[in-house]
Amino acid sequence: MLTDEYIKRVYDQVVARDGDQPEFLQAVREVFETLQPVVEKHPEYEKAGVLERIVEPERTIKFRVAWVDDEGKVQVNRGYRIQFNSAIGPYKGGLRFHPTVTESVVKFLGFEQILKNSLTTLPMGGGKGGSDFNPKGKSDAEVMRFCQAFMTELSRHIGQFTDVPAGDINVGGREIGYLFGQYKRIRDEYSGVLTGKGLEFGGSLARTEATGYGVCYYTQEALRVLRNDSFEGKTVVISGSGNVATYAAQKAEQLGAKVVTVSDSNGYIYDPNGINVEVVKQIKEVERGRIKEYAERVPGSEYHEGSKGVWTVKGDIALPCATQNEVDGESAQKLVDNGVTVVVEGANMPSTPEAIEVYQKNGVLYGPAKAANAGGVAVSGLEMSQNSYRLSWTFEEVDAKLKSIMEEIVANSLAAAKEYDHEGDLMLGANAAGFVKVANAMVAQGVL
């Protein structure tokens, strides 16, 4: 509930202006509800209009993307780039290619990115972009032509010191390669304008694994500090089968857990013997197939239709790694009833407000997305550093830096929670720690 007058006034203004953007409103309200003790302690934020400014993007770019498919037909999609806040560094955030991409979705992701990037302690502002283009079922040539058309417009708005996009859902190494090539051709320059690049042309080792590994490093540290516990011997329920889910499963198993599920938009796999990550990688990364094929290849595993069913599986730890709002209140209650005591988010905003309420009422250790899945953008920041230095670090060096960053995020979140009288609250702590750094920078730089 919003009780602070300043916060309530600003939120009402956001609703009046952006009432047709439900995902964005949800993200803003979740953050605002936890910022009330922060705003009360810092009256200078109201005087400087920090809340009014932080919820309004510095720039919203929306454009047509016209391209030709393999049959010679002209196709038209929408492209977006939200340059949300540059108070602590150049805009930084991924590109998502998915039919569900709208201005509201990109805006909520960009808003979350401001605080997420702040939490990494690296100098990166918040941004996000994408298109309603769906690469699934498209040939490599069609994906290439779309990426080239998309970058033809985007190239005039980005740069290594201005805005550095990365990948997100359906934007992996293939797409980043096509986008980077087109930027290089148009701008006639070779720079670190994108992250998630191939190792042959400026990418970083451990970038592919970063988000999933980071989720597990965060979870392991939160368990250690708050419960004197670890992944060892735990049963883990994971949703999704993309980059984040796959490498979260891999790292959880390395840390001694047994991962029993993965899913996609059609259904989920239950493997009581533990998910074989190499089979998942072969199906999803190499063959670009559907997860149901796992059951055809791994004896003893089961495929079930309906992705929401994954939350009915018994476990100790749940890592939602698929998409926004995948866990509603009913699903959260099923998780609790099935013994889950830890929920850490790998996807962006995968839990609805009702689900978060269930976690809090039942004493679930809850790690919010903006903190827990910051590993991807953290290693993107490390890739930017390597590009600037014109050198490459080893996998072990990058992985060690990632682990240190995730442990620092837990420590900073808990310190902020304690400072604002909500000891142990990782959600309030993450929002407060991320916000205060950006807010102080905004105050120092004047009204912009």
Q: Where does each model-flagged region fall?
A:
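Glycine/serine-rich phosphate-binding loop and adjoining beta1-alpha1 elements at the start
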Residues: H98, N117-E232
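Rossmann-like adenosine-cofactor binding region
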Residues: G267-Y366, A371
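Flexible, glycine/charged-enriched surface loops at secondary-structure junctions
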Residues: P22-L25, K41-A48, T121, I158-G167, ...
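N-terminal cap/recognition module
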Residues: K73-I114
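Adenosine-phosphate binding glycine-rich loop
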Residues: L2-A27, A222-L223, K334-L448
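Structured beta-strand/loop patches that form or line metal/cofactor-binding pockets in enzymes
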Residues: E44-Q75
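Glycine-rich phosphate/diphosphate-binding loop of Rossmann-like nucleotide-binding domains
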Residues: G203-K314
